[in-house]
Design a protein with these regions (language model features):
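Conserved catalytic core of the tyrosine transesterase superfamily
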Residues: 1-227
Length: 227
């Protein structure tokens, strides 16, 4: 049991963690929902079992001033999970917050749009990454998580790990994509990561401990796609 919290909150928090794990959620989702309850607990002196709408309105108003809308939404989702699974109460405040609408990039691009994207991207890592996503039909997170071992050149397929629904899947590997990936790998020669982080430059890519930065990839994609 967690000992750094008051006893009543520690029991609730431990129950929250158990329910999160039993639901088979992704580790990053578990971390976010757990952090939400810790933050709420700290704000309300660890008494969060009977919060009113007025109290939560005040909490989220303060949170918006110091955190991103993404963090605000995750705290809301974490509280909703806690309310329904730990407190066993119905969630009665669906309209508590309303994030501003954002312009999202299309999930599917045409062949012409994809070609313009590849040609307009100046950074080699991003260009190869976008080409790989498009040719294999991967999501952003799936592409970032690719490793050298996931590429099966003999059977011409790619193993995508922890895909949607926490399931692994196999996708066909086009010959052109294999050729591009092989040439690209020669530029960094990382023993594991297919798209190593370039924060330390090309020479440091071989020793990178993480893949390309998700935020940097999204920002570059948005700039190119909306140019």
């Amino acid at each position: 049991m967690t000992t750094s919290f008051p006893a009543h909150f520690a029991r609730q928090y431990d129950s929250h963690l158990k329910h999160l794990k039993l639901k088979g959620l992704q580790p990053k989702t578990i971390d976010a929902y757990a952090r939400a309850i810790r933050r709420l607990g700290g704000y309300f002196d660890y008494r969060i079992e009977a919060l009113t709408e007025a109290q939560l309105t005040e909490y989220f108003s303060d949170l918006i001033g110091t955190h991103s809308w993404s963090a605000v939404k995750l705290d809301l989702y974490g509280l909703k999970f806690f309310t329904t699974h730990v407190l066993k109460k119905p969630w009665a405040m669906p309209d508590l917050i309303k994030p501003p609408k954002t312009q999202r990039l299309p999930d599917i691009v045409t062949v012409d749009e994809a070609q313009r994207l590849f040609l307009a991207t100046r950074v080699l890592s991003y260009r190869v990454f976008y080409f790989t996503l498009y040719s294999l039909g991967l999501r952003l997170g799936e592409g970032l998580a690719l490793t050298v071992a996931d590429i099966d050149a003999e059977r011409m397929r790619v193993q995508v790990r922890d895909a949607k629904g926490n399931r692994d899947r196999l996708v066909p590997l086009p010959q052109a994509t294999l050729a591009v990936l092989r040439r690209f790998w020669l530029t960094h020669r990382h023993p594991e990561l297919l798209f190593p982080n370039r924060s330390a430059g090309l020479k440091g890519a071989q020793r990178a401990s993480s893949p390309l930065d998700r935020g940097g990839v999204q920002l570059t994609l948005r700039k190119v796609a909306t140019a």
